Regions:
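Bacterial N-terminal signal peptides that target proteins for export
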Residues: 2-10
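N-terminal signal peptide c-region/cleavage motif recognized by signal peptidases
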Residues: 18-20
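Compositionally biased alpha-helical segments
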Residues: 24-94
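Zn2+-dependent metallopeptidase catalytic core
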Residues: 64-67, 72, 76-210, 218-232, ...
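Surface-exposed patches in mature extracellular/periplasmic domains of secreted proteins
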Residues: 163-181, 243-252, 259-262, 282-288, ...
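Zinc-dependent metallopeptidase catalytic helix centered on the HExxH motif
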Residues: 209-282, 288
Length: 528
């Protein structure tokens, strides 16, 4: 269209339709419906000389010849806006609220378009009982005030990271190319925070899938926005299977044939949220503390599913910023994250354990890209889960209540001898010690090594040992400020860790494995 000669004539009688000239790109006239479940419409206007708006029709002139469109074929009266830039995404009516009349602006309760706000990729609905002000969404029995615009701000930051950096969705190949993710604020004072996705229909009856989440004002304000980012993270996890099919995206459990629950959703959602609020990752007084108390557990153990949100930093340092999203998209039913990791990267079980051990050694001093500076005040805070066998000979054994499991680890704070001293750990893996739980003892395996840190921040990593009986050693460097001994449970063969909220944990015979060990130190000892 020649925009210099373009002119717009609006009939005075037609005040119900808005036709703003929003951009120089006037090759298309776009229609955005007030019923946000109705797909946007478009009218070609390329090469037009002028557009005339009358009380009953739209005339588009090309070389003086008019082409007319009656309004009834384009928009319902008082039901749409017309514009020269694409209105972007619309909404899918979720099956969750299939019986809700979103066009009933007079409703006193429930959800409708009149009680919603939108951004480029998200829509926020609040229950009409909260009132009309999107900036003051407050339950009479609760003190928290949610602001729908603040929710959108956090959500859009999530989009930039989860889609733009982490790769959970691929623009141009995603349902989010058409549909906005929907977030709802229910009318209740109690805690509620959940998200995933659902199927639904547009106004034309076309089915699709969309991300959907819920949080009360309490949850919307929690953790400085981290809870919002966590729940939005779940919608992106769901969208993996929406885009690629349910054999991708870990919509299954790990009992061998895909049934049960999946704690990896929570682990990754917390890590995703920390990418939005990185300043909270080592300071919020919550998940890091839980992590310190639980990292001896199986990597996929449900008891620390919210706190297992630190290994992802190592994996993305090792394999790229988008690796977590890549794992989600390339996962295949019924494999768990360890199996997916190994398959995607072509690693053997030994190679996987070696990579994990390197990560845990780095975690001793948080020598990991992206967290190295923010976590430096946390160095030395790992707990020593050992019991003394013989203090005189510096002999210790893994504590039975905190013994390492598959891919669980101990980071033990050690005393620092003088520079040049050779410290040793004479290690014995135990497969028949009394009091421990053995599962597949024939698959027993360990990794163990020393780590030293110098005053200038340089790290020195000792050679990793793997023998059931062996010796790890390290020569203490100059200006050594910290010394650690790291041990990891490294089974020689992987097996899944099932979890089902409706089944007692004791029902799973393959769970609860322990890899105890005894170690006798020379020239150093643990500092409890």
């Amino acid at each position: 269209m020649n925009t210099k000669s373009f002119r717009l004539i609006i009939a005075t009688a037609l005040a119900l339709l808005a036709l703003p000239l929003l951009a120089a790109d006037g090759d298309t006239i776009w229609v955005r419906y007030d019923n946000r479940f109705k797909p946007n419409a478009s009218i070609p206007a390329k090469g037009a000389d002028s557009i005339e708006v009358t009380t009953s029709q739209l005339r588009i002139y090309t070389n003086g010849t008019p082409r007319t469109r009656p309004y009834g074929a384009i928009v319902p009266l008082d039901g749409a806006d017309m514009m020269f830039t694409s209105p972007g995404r619309y909404l899918l009516k979720p099956s969750t609220y299939s019986g809700t009349n979103y066009e009933n602006a007079a409703a006193k309760a429930g959800y409708n378009f009149a009680h919603s706000v939108e951004s480029e990729h998200f829509a926020v609905f609040w229950d009409a009982q909260f009132g009309n002000d999107p900036t003051r969404i407050k339950h009479p029995n609760g003190g928290d005030v949610a602001n729908a615009y603040n929710v959108l701000d956090v959500a859009e930051k999530c989009w930039q990271v989860y889609a733009g950096e982490l790769g959970f969705v691929v623009p141009g190949k995603s349902s989010t190319d058409k549909y906005k993710i929907q977030l709802y604020i229910p009318y209740q004072s109690e805690w509620r925070a959940d998200a995933s996705g659902t199927d639904g229909q547009d106004a034309n009856g076309t089915w699709g899938q969309t991300g959907i989440g819920h949080f009360t004002p309490w949850a919307a304000n929690a953790r400085g926005g981290h809870t919002i980012a966590h729940e939005v993270g779940h919608t992106f996890q769901y969208l993996v299977s929406a885009d690629l099919g349910t054999d991708h995206g870990w919509r299954w459990g790990f009992n061998g044939y895909g049934a049960g629950d999946c704690g990896w959703w929570e682990s990754c959602a917390d890590w995703q949220a920390y990418q939005i609020f990185p300043e909270r990752q080592f300071t919020d007084g919550e998940y890091f503390e839980q992590h310190l108390n639980a990292h001896y557990l199986n990597l996929l153990h449900e008891d620390w599913r919210y706190a297992c949100c630190y290994i992802q930093d190592w994996w993305t340092m090792k394999h790229g910023r988008n690796f977590i999203g890549r794992m989600w998209r390339e996962s295949k039913r019924p494999e768990d994250p360890v199996q997916a990791y190994k398959r995607i990267l072509g690693l053997t079980q030994d190679e996987f354990c070696d990579e994990q051990m390197e990560g845990y050694m780095r975690m001793a001093t948080w020598d990991i890209d992206g967290v190295r500076t923010r976590a430096q005040h946390r160095i030395g805070q790992h707990k020593t889960w050992l019991r003394t066998i013989n203090a005189a000979t510096a002999t210790y054994q893994a504590d039975v209540d905190h013994c390492i499991q598959n891919y669980g680890y101990h980071i033990i704070n050690m005393s620092r001898p003088a520079a040049g001293t050779v410290v040793k750990a004479n290690f014995t893996g135990l497969t028949d010690a009394v009091g421990y739980r053995y599962v597949y003892p024939e698959r027993a395996g360990w990794r163990y090594a020393f780590v030293a840190m110098q005053k200038d921040g340089t790290r020195l990593y000792g050679e990793v040992q793997r023998d059931k009986e062996g010796t790890a050693q390290l020569t203490i460097p100059e200006n050594c400020t910290r010394l650690f001994f790291v041990v990891m449970g490294a089974p020689t063969q992987h097996w899944q860790h099932p979890w089902d909220r409706n089944v007692a944990a004791s029902s799973w015979a393959q769970n609860g494995e322990q890899w105890p060990y005894q170690v006798q130190f020379e020239q150093t000892k643990p500092t409890f």
